[in-house]
């Protein structure tokens, strides 16, 4: 009986953590990087936002066998003057979350959040980072993900659009199906 109470408490705590609201990633809590590349062979680019290394994690061989979950570092670059909200959708949110990106510390699922709103520094603010001489705002962060790999549907809302652009990424899951309607 005691084991059931402990397991129930852990589930409630994780469920509470997964539903937690998150602080936005803003100019005030950005990181700084030297000259960067926005679009590489491993970049996921949606409008003014780039995850410049996320596609490198697609092969199942990207797993490093840590359990019960692992941390996949993938920063974000956002062109000046833009806002993009990214949401992990569907069942993937139970096993995957955003960590870092100007929020609280930690790299576990319990530390993660399911939605991040990225607001770049304004066109006349110094972000300290650039791509091709053009200002971008940079945030360090990534994903907490299960050790078995997962296909993660992401909805991108660019510049306060109410219409999502859905992309499915592979975090060590190999090839993922094409996204359904967003």
Sequence positions of predicted segments:
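Secretory targeting and sorting signals
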Residues: 1-19
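Non-catalytic macromolecular-recognition regions in eukaryotic signaling proteins
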Residues: 15-182
